[in-house]
Amino acid sequence: MDLRSLETKELIFKGLQEEHIKNPLIYGLTQKNAFALGKADYAPSDRNGLFVTPMGCSFFIVPLINAICRSGTMEEKALCFDAMLTMKAFNMILSNKRGHKQGEMERVVDQALRTLTNVKNRQTRAEEAGLTLLEKRVPAMIDNKVFVFSVGEEVDPNIRGLVANKMMAKYQRPVCVVSKLSDGTYAGSMRGFTKTGIESFKEVAETSPACIWVRGHDNAAGLCITDPEQFMQDMNAKLANISTEILYYVDYVFNAANINPNIILSLADANDYLGTGFDRPQIYIEEIELDSLTIMKGNTIKLSTFPGTEIMKFGATDEEVEKLSTFKGTMNAVCKPVKNEWCGNVKPQLMIIDYELVKSEPGIMAAWGF
């Protein structure tokens, strides 16, 4: 749903107000994930009366419903369906939680919330196993405009679309994950990548003689092909002029010494509106001096710039910390703007998405050997 449509936006805004969330299971998910939904990236503003933002919903509610539909057993699906009905959600049933006492009872909705989490964790483990398998094949096909992976049962058919989506986002090109059928053809899921100018990978795929059918949306569909290698070569020819270089689309470019904190705060306050068609703003910061580097708990990197805007990266590797601590030069970084609220104080922050290091040019004295 495109949030640039005023009608769509209004329907979403009405639906995400607390008084309109009547579904017991959905409301339970908002309570269970209240901490995550309140983080700076997802928290609603005070302007529109939202209880949950569209992005918060898409990250912490929708994936659990998606997981039960894709990876749940029929018994698990039936339980969660009952938890969506007011007339059944609050009925008492025998508890199945770990360590429960003999005859212990709990509400249908409480058991369903726990089941959703368990199924999502199960799906995530399967997804990570599939991604690990496919990552090993990437070096052999990195020069192709489209990745086509032929897999067996080692990648669960129910999550092939999710795996394709993750690979598409990482490598910024269309991805297909297919398996061989009994008739010798290959069927599976595809995901397109629109930011290189391919508005409908479905239409592009249908031009290949190796394509039997594509069914679904423009950039998220099922497909059937005769030969993965031939299909990939057809796509290479069709998309010959499309770049596969990793790109970042940014809204502002600042030198680190001239960051405008008011712009950072304004962009960070756009959470209510982010979603399909309205991406999170990104900012490119040049010439960040590493002299201000501070390594905090959990390998959190903090860089303090002249106007008082902190640039952060959480969960850096030990290798990153070592390199940044000893590097002689500056950093250029693509960042997302957030606002940090603590004890009533609001400060602008920039969270690093990706970065490059630029070595300092040796001064004339160093060049002369002094």
Model-derived features: positions:
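Mid-to-C-terminal polyanion-binding domains and interfaces
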Residues: G99-V151, V155, D183-T185, E203-F370
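Hydrophobic helix-and-loop "lid/oligomerization" segment in the mid-to-C-terminal part
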Residues: M1-E229, A256, I295
